[in-house]
Amino acid sequence: MQGTNRDGVGDRLKMSRKKEIRKVTIGETAVSLPGIIAVARHGAPVVLSEKAAFRRRMENSRRLLSQALEADVPVYGVTTGFGKSCGTLLSKKSLPQNGETLMRFHGCGTGDPLGIEETRAAMLCRLLCLARGYSAVSLPLLEQLAAFLNLGITPVIPSEGSVGASGDLTPLSYVLGAMAGEREVFYRGKRMPAAKALRLAKLKPYLFGPKEPLSMVNGTSVMTGIAAIVLDRAQHLIEAATSATALSVHALRGKAHHYHPAIGEAKSFPGQIDVAGRLREL
């Protein structure tokens, strides 16, 4: 007898039994939790979509920024300062240093590094966000971030120092720095300077264009990536707990009708209904 599936709870209970994801394509469709786990934990490759609509969207976003700069339109964080300094216009000579200043200013994280899984999940979430075409970043930036994931270059991100409210500014600044060949990364099982890892991987340090440093750090991708890892672990715990319960009931010669659908329907709790259905299956 099958359990009732409400709000996808039953689907989530069976997540661990779904077909393995071997590749994640960026820029076409939304990436679900299994896709994030496939990249973060299992090293599934990421590729940028070749579809014209995706590439046109990215180019149009970048072009809009260029047009604003050419017209001397003030652009926050590009031609102005950050935060309370948003009313301060910067000289054209100082524009290239603005992004570097942002990166170094936020390099104040503390604590042990985040795990490899959590960091890779955060990087993928940032890539997915930027690939939507609203942040005026270029395709080469996305390619560099994808290359880091595919080559196993993982920035060393301190686990403490972010409030997440307007963005995981501090932790994401470490991703920003690593892409530019600064700070440290984990690569080939070792912790090393990012510049050395880039040389070994035959990658060039990325030269960020206007606004790209701000676009990289001003998002909540780190907390999103960590949440994805935690949710996946919780799903596995639910599956394990449900299996253990079924085994215990069987050992004690319990009755399946104790988990009859009518009992769950009386309370209408989706989780209870789906766990009861899974117990009946087992």
List the predicted regions and their residue ranges.
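N-terminal amphipathic/basic-hydrophobic helices that include classical n-h-c signal peptides
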Residues: 1-14
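Conserved, well-structured ligand/cofactor-binding cores
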Residues: 12-282
